[in-house]
From Swiss-Prot:
Tissue-level expression: In the embryo, widely expressed in the developing nervous system and in mesodermal tissues.
InterPro entries assigned: Galactose-bd-like_sf (IPR008979), Laminin/Netrin_ECM (IPR050440), Laminin_N (IPR008211), LE_dom (IPR002049), LMN_ATRN_NET-like_EGF (IPR056863), Netrin_domain (IPR001134), Netrin_module_non-TIMP (IPR018933), TIMP-like_OB-fold (IPR008993)
Subcellular location as annotated: Secreted; Cytoplasm
Descriptive protein name: Netrin-1
Length: 604
């Protein structure tokens, strides 16, 4: 009998080794350590390959929580044996306080010696509807190959095996054993297993015979008869089916000889109990093909020693910064290692984008976050605005991007050419940073037109007119302080308007300002309307800050009537009065209007 038991367990271990071989990992061999590669997770060329932890009895040495144990208080129990047709009973005492007479749960998972069996034992005659449960926590997720129990008593008439995948919070059935499946568990007897239900528990009457009275075995193989077992790598259903963090065995109904209700039923009932010498859970630490062993972490929790740039207790996610493709379980063909994002050494964080991954032909989906060293882009592969590439350094260099340093006055913007570093210069300005006037231009005092053409002096004759001044100081006197506005100045000009400068454009020898005329306080023969209008000022006047004017500012403009280049705008020149607007002036200008109507401008 004992020989048959050990032959059955040996067969299960052989199945486990075969499954390990199919998955590409080591089996149970006394020479495995000698034949193994130096790094089981990489091949001889250093390329990643699938690796799995050794096959173990995950129950060995672990605590088992049981709902019933004999010996508290001490109680009699009887062992039944048969001699021919004669049934014999030898009675003993179970006493939890006496180590020689105790049958604690620790005997379930200790070293199983067939020559010196140690048995856990329940209280006597806990018959249906009462049950007895054994609950084993594996400490982490395992991929379970089999669950086996060797009995010191007759095997149960009805028994169920459950598993938990969330550390005992919820339970799902793994397997049922009963001679009355429908009555006990509301399950059909030996229902066929198909691809549609291969993740469901079945009920069978195998292993439920009362005999042998001692030494019987119940062994459940998780993949036996499952249609997708031969293609386990590509079956997420079965991968989920064999995964467990906890195992629970529920003994539901005792096998009896039917004598428990006879006159001497007390002796008979003391002969019916559950006793188990060995509980085994054969399997491997679940690491999804990305680790060759499990280790204890700082919290003494069992975790996978992850490789292939993976992380997590089961190597079930990519470690930080390795999100260039989605996490996948390793297979015999592909290690499916996690790949680092390509950020050219300029970022420490990245994220995965499925749309980009699909567009790349499922090659790359990483997006870099918070690019440093003045870089930008999905891969931190170009320079951000205001910087350009230093082609003398590789893109991975921390100084691969140089500041444009565009001149605040000479440049038309802060962004330069990404390759050459050339800033966009205003008219008449040159240099890579727009920091000097071009040939034929001279510096002015205007931030709008910092460089103006050098005037060409006309030929001198006796009848020639006075020459144009050579510099701004002799041409006009720019305002250096606050300008004052009074009735006399108001009366001397043809128009007085409040304007808002919107934008400025160069037009030949003129600057054309688009302005919004907010209020009209005086106008000459040409009618001035409120709204958007063109204001024309000669380039020389702007260059010499006569008048001094800036975009996006509001001004009070007093000028003389003059035909504009477009015949519809107004003209200002070096003689015009341009003062930055103050709201307090509106009332004073209305008074000037009233005085003008009364003819006081003629006196002024």
């Amino acid at each position: 009998m004992m020989r048959a038991v050990w032959e059955a367990l040996a067969a299960l271990a052989a199945v486990a080794c075969l499954v390990g071989a199919v998955r590409g990992g080591p089996g149970l061999s006394m020479f495995a350590g000698q034949a193994a590669q130096p790094d089981p997770c990489s091949d001889e060329n250093g390329h990643p390959r699938r690796c799995i932890p050794d096959f173990v009895n995950a129950a060995f040495g672990k605590d088992v929580r049981v709902s019933s144990t004999c010996g508290r208080p001490p109680a009699r129990y009887c062992v039944v044996s048969e001699r021919g047709e004669e049934r014999l009973r030898s009675c003993h005492l179970c006493n939890s306080s006496d180590p020689k007479k105790a049958h604690p749960p620790a005997f379930l998972t200790d070293l199983n010696n067939p020559h010196n069996l140690t048995c856990w034992q329940s209280e006597n005659y806990l018959q249906f509807p009462h049950n007895v449960t054994l609950t084993l926590s594996l400490g982490k997720k395992f991929e379970v190959t089999y669950v086996s129990l060797q009995f010191c008593s007759p095997r149960p008439e009805s028994m169920a095996i459950y598993k938990s995948m969330d550390y005992g919070r919820t339970w799902v059935p793994f397997q049922f054993y009963s001679t009355q499946c429908r009555k006990m568990y509301n399950r059909p007897h030996r229902a066929p297993i198909t691809k549609q239900n291969e993740q469901e528990a079945v009920c069978t009457d195998s292993h439920t015979d009362m005999r042998p009275l001692s030494g019987g075995l119940i062994a459940f193989s998780t993949l036996d008869g499952r249609p997708s077992a031969h293609d386990f790598d590509n079956s997420p259903v079965l991968q989920d089916w064999v995964t467990a963090t906890d195992i629970r065995v529920a003994f539901s109904r005792l096998h009896t000889f039917g004598d428990e209700n006879e006159d001497d039923s007390e002796l008979a009932r003391d002969s019916y109990y559950y006793a188990v010498s060995d509980l085994q859970v054969g399997g491997r630490c679940k690491c999804n093909g990305h680790a060759a062993r499990c280790v204890r972490d700082r919290d003494d929790s069992l975790v996978c020693d992850c490789r292939h740039n993976t992380a997590g207790p089961e190597c079930d996610r990519c470690k930080p910064f390795h999100y260039d493709r989605p996490w996948q379980r390793a297979t015999a063909r592909e290690a499916n290692e996690c790949v680092a994002c390509n950020c050219n050494l300029h970022a420490r964080r990245c994220r995965f984008n499925m749309e980009l991954y699909k567009l790349s032909g499922r090659k790359s989906g990483g997006v870099c976050l918070n690019c440093r060293h003045n870089t930008a882009g999905r891969h931190c592969h170009y320079c951000k605005e205001g910087f350009y590439r230093d082609m003398g350094k590789p893109i991975t260099h921390r100084k691969a991007c140089k500041a444009c340093d565009c001149h605040p006055v000479g440049a038309a913007g802060k962004t330069c050419n990404q390759t050459t570093g050339q800033c966009p210069c205003k008219d008449g300005v040159t240099g890579i940073t727009c920091n000097r006037c071009a040939k034929g231009y001279q510096q002015s005092r205007s931030p709008i037109a910092p460089c103006i053409k050098i005037p060409v002096a006309p030929p001198t004759t006796a009848a020639s007119s006075v020459e144009e001044p050579e510099d701004c100081d002799s041409y006009c006197k720019a305002s250096k302080g606050k300008l004052k506005m009074n009735m006399k100045k108001y009366c001397r000009k043809d128009y007085a308007v409040q304007i808002h400068i919107l934008k400025a454009d160069k037009a030949g020898d003129w600057w054309k300002f688009t302005v919004n005329i907010i209020s009209v306080y005086k106008q000459g023969t040409s009618r001035i309307r409120r709204g958007d209008q063109s204001l024309w000022i000669r380039s020389r006047d702007i260059a010499c800050k006569c008048p001094k004017i800036k975009p996006l500012k509001k001004y009070l403009l007093l000028g003389n009537a003059e035909d504009s280049p477009d015949q519809s705008g107004i003209v200002a020149d070096k003689s015009s009065l341009v003062i930055q607007w103050r709201d307090t002036w509106a009332r004073r200008l209305r008074k000037f209007q009233q005085r003008e109507k009364k003819g006081k401008c003629k006196k002024a």
